[in-house]
Design a protein with these regions (language model features):
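C-terminal capping/gating helix-and-loop segments adjacent to ligand/active sites or protein-protein/ligand interfaces
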Residues: 689, 752-827
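Short, well-ordered beta-strand elements
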Residues: 396-408, 427-434, 479, 525
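Extracytoplasmic "Venus flytrap"/periplasmic binding protein-like
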Residues: 434-510, 644-654, 666-667
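Repeated scaffold domains used in trafficking and secretory/extracellular systems
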Residues: 77-86, 143-155, 195-210, 248-260, ...
Length: 835
């Protein structure tokens, strides 16, 4: 990021942010808390943009090994799930669970069916040095009919398994622990844990604290409050049970346990609102509150899994790499960023630490290769060894910082980053998550669509402010991944127009309308690498005169006649209005000027006042099957209201469609539906796109042209095809149609067995609901994409103003002209102060 300080504009921007945050509740914490969090958890707080990589900067050579899972290759598999049981200096032990494909049909005697005839429970013991499998132990052969393997752990040279069995006669569960020698497979010890509910709970994590081993399990009391049970094994093998429980407090997670010497340990426990700290006496099992001030400098929300080295150093993984804890100096130190190697970060970011030091480490775990068009859930187990290189192969290059929330990057984007870094002579992309801290927000009281939208607006407003301020001060990232929902940034002060790097594409080869609709005031700030479709999935015959959407009058008719008066858009008036406003925002804000005096603004407001419920239903009410049915299709977040009994639930659904599979599944669930229409508007416009993966480039980037080269890379045929075959809507028509044909073939075959409609009243599958798909359905989906009329990139700060100012009009307390004038003035001030 260029250090060009635009002082006057930055000063005005700070004033604008103060106004935006004032419109929010005090729940947040301001943009400052987002960009400069005082807690440390491994995430870097300062940009490295523009820094030149030196030869002695960290770089790690890697070796990736895929472990062959010992299953019967002659039997078709339903799924496998491998996971790490434990590791020491001799062996790595992996537990693989799963099932072979079971029979189907009415001729199966399910009452006497033994599921364990198809179960997979195998322990693989690998030599620590050679990585060869030296022993496989089949746990299924000794399982009782109603038993299953709950967990397995490997510590102190022995494997400990937990088997839980259900008793048909007493309707009770009992658990047995078994110690097994890893090489001979012989049983060393067996313990009946009885039918105590706590002792039957799954072991969640195992920690090594000095000479002690601590197993943790989460439980719930009669009031549904979560608490933890700790099983402490001392150096002599004696075991003690300790409860970590506090009245009225839900303890949801223990990410790590800190050894502080003298047989004492500190337990950080995540609750619904914050982190509590407890001191555990390992000798006598007593637990007391710890001094939080001694440990609250640690950001436990960013800690994923941990490893305690033989010297007592605690290393832990974060969303962007590996850090270690320095208790003495109360800080953490990043020793590895997932960018500092040649392995795709989307693979290694989900693995566990097997061992770690400053000079090398081992990650291992499940690698689930997602393929939406294959009927298989078989996972690989991989081991990746990293060793610090003698010199950095990218020395001399300058760093381009890519911001991604929580450091999340999918496989295709990850591959593109690696390709760019290998081919660029002058620049190196490094991913950070400096603005991902939303731990200040309380989600426990969210119980409706309105609640969720209000909180999302507040979070997005503060995220936008934090990014905008740092960009203007020359301290922000160069490339921004997936920030299309931060509409405030769509301004030449913050982002560059990417149109020159895309060029003039052929509309016959690309969905150029998607790029046009993504523009704001003629500029392409957010490049939609792939995208979703937002709208109302229904039958094309219900469309208004435009054929792609509804005017407010047409939707009112559709609502009252077809939907029997119950809207499928589950929002209250204020939130509903912001949806309609953002769908037509180019009518109300043009070139930084707000105008809410138009007939279009009045029409939307009057429609909402006359036809929309004041507040959205609570989720408690929605999930009451006497009142509402939640859609069971693949569409995320879709809801269908039952309304009166005569209302047909298969008429329409308001949803976000993520790909061809999602489109097909909605066709099946809502038999006869084949299109996605726009939400109510004044001109009957079509549905909107919402970027699923988007790229933006800062106006203050270290080198805009270098960032533009990365954007070009994402439009390449290989990337577009790979994204399309991962069930995403892409810009390339050829890639879209090629993936569509693969989807048609799959869902007309074995994939269709899992794509059936469900009766919303009973939740049971509907007979004969399977559909036969064809190339015509691909044509229909292509027409839907062509009909899209805008991009969802709302400005959260403006949303918050509209929610506050329009409410008195909807309640009948003020006239529309009055509230529109006030809202317009407030919005204009925000726009002016942004520059």
């Amino acid at each position: 990021m260029k250090r060009s300080f635009l002082k006057i504009t930055a000063t005005l921007l700070i004033a604008s942010m103060a106004m935006s945050i004032a419109a929010c509740s005090s729940n947040g914490g301001g943009s400052h808390s987002l960009s400069n969090n005082n807690k440390t958890g491994g995430s870097r707080s300062e940009s490295r943009s523009g820094d030149k990589i030196s030869s002695d900067d960290p770089w790690f050579d890697s070796n990736l090994l895929k472990v062959d899972i010992p299953v019967d290759g002659s039997r078709p598999l339903e799924y496998t799930y491998p996971r790490l049981a434990g590791v020491d200096d001799k062996y790595i032990v992996v537990l693989t669970s799963g099932y072979y494909k079971m029979p189907t049909g009415n001729d199966v005697d399910w009452n006497n069916f033994n599921y364990n005839d198809y179960a997979i429970n195998v322990l693989s013991v690998l030599d620590r040095n050679s990585k060869d499998i030296v022993n496989s132990i089949d746990l299924t052969k000794d399982l009782p009919k109603n038993g299953y393997i709950d967990s397995a752990s490997y510590t102190d040279g022995k494997i400990t398994t937990r088997c839980t069995t259900y008793d048909d006669a007493t309707y009770s569960m009992s658990t047995t622990e078994t110690d097994i020698d890893p090489i001979s497979g012989n049983v060393l010890d067996k313990r009946d844990l009885g039918n105590d509910e706590e002792d039957n709970s799954s072991i969640e994590r195992t920690f090594k604290v000095g000479e002690y081993k601590i197993d943790t399990s989460v439980n719930w009391d009669n009031n549904d409050n979560a608490y933890y049970v700790l099983y402490i094994t001392d150096p002599n093998g004696d075991r003690d049970k300790v409860k970590l429980k506090e009245t009225g407090v839900n303890i949801y997670d223990i990410p790590l346990i800190l050894s502080v010497g003298n047989d004492k340990a500190i337990i950080p426990a995540r609750t619904e609102n914050d982190t509590k700290y407890y001191e555990l006496d390992l000798k006598n099992g007593s637990v007391d509150p710890a001094n939080e001030k001694e440990y609250n400098w640690l950001d436990f929300d960013s800690i994923y899994n941990s490893f305690t080295a033989p010297d007592g150093t605690i290393y832990f993984t974060t969303s962007i790499g590996i850090s270690k804890i320095d208790l003495k100096n109360k800080r953490t130190e990043e020793i590895f960023n997932y960018s500092w190697c040649g392995v795709n970060r989307s693979i290694i970011s989900y693995l566990e630490l097997v061992e770690c030091s400053d000079d090398g480490f081992v990650l291992a775990g499940e690698n689930y290769a997602y393929n939406p068009y294959q009927n298989s859930s078989v996972s690989d187990f991989i081991i990746v060894e990293f060793n610090k290189a003698s010199k950095n192969p990218h020395a001399g290059k300058k760093i381009l910082e890519m911001y991604s929330a929580y450091g999340s990057v999918n496989e295709e984007i990850g591959d593109a980053i690696i390709q760019f870094n290998e081919n660029s002579k002058d620049y190196f992309i490094e991913v950070t998550d400096r603005y991902s801290n939303d731990s200040n927000y309380d989600y426990s009281n969210i119980n409706s669509e309105d609640d969720w939208e209000n909180l999302s607006n507040k979070i997005n407003a503060e995220m936008s402010n934090a990014l905008a301020m740092d960009i203007m001060n020359g301290e922000g990232p160069d490339i921004l991944l997936n920030t299309s929902d931060l509409g405030q940034l769509n301004n030449t002060n913050y982002l560059v127009d990417l149109s020159p790097y895309i060029g003039n594409l052929d509309s016959g080869k690309y969905f150029t309308n998607v790029l046009e609709e993504a523009k704001v005031d003629g500029n392409l700030y957010q490049f939609p690498v792939c995208y979703t479709i937002e709208g109302i999935h229904t039958d094309a015959k219900y469309a208004g005169a435009s054929g792609v959407g509804f005017t407010t009058k047409e939707y009112e008719k559709f609502l009252n006649e077809t939907l029997n008066g119950t809207d499928v858009i589950p929002a209250g008036q204020a939130i509903y209005f912001t949806k309609l406003f953002n769908n037509m925002s180019e009518k109300f804000i043009v070139d930084g000027k707000a105008d809410f005096s138009s007939a279009e603004f009045e029409q939307l407001a009057e429609y909402v006042k006359d036809n929309v419920q004041l507040n959205s239903k609570s989720w408690d009410e929605m999930y009451n099957y006497d009142d509402v049915v939640t859609d069971v299709s693949y569409a995320v977040g879709t809801t269908v209201f039952k309304g009166d009994y005569s209302y047909s639930e298969d008429k329409a659904v308001f949803c976000t469609t993520y790909g061809i599979s999602n489109y097909f599944s909605n066709m099946v669930q809502y038999q006869g539906t084949n299109t996605i229409l726009g939400i109510p508007s004044t001109d009957g416009r079509g549905p909107r796109i919402a970027p699923y993966f988007s790229i933006a480039v800062s106006s203050q980037a270290e080198n805009v042209d270098a960032c533009g080269e990365f954007v070009k890379l994402l439009l390449s045929d290989d990337v577009q095809k790979s994204l399309a075959l991962s069930d995403n809507f892409v810009l390339s028509r050829e890639a879209f149609r090629e993936a569509g044909k693969v989807a048609v073939e799959y869902y007309n075959g074995e994939g269709g067995d899992y794509m059936v409609a469900y009766d919303p009243k009973t939740g049971m599958p509907v007979d004969n609901s399977r559909l036969t798909f064809s190339e015509k359905n691909i044509d229909d989906m292509e027409k839907i994409i062509d009909s899209c009329s805008g991009m969802n990139s709302s400005d959260a700060s403006i949303n918050l103003i509209l929610i506050e100012e329009m409410q008195p009009y909807f309640l009948g307390q003020k006239d529309l002209k009055n509230v529109a004038t006030v809202a317009q003035d407030r919005v204009q001030k925000v726009l002016d102060e942004r520059g």
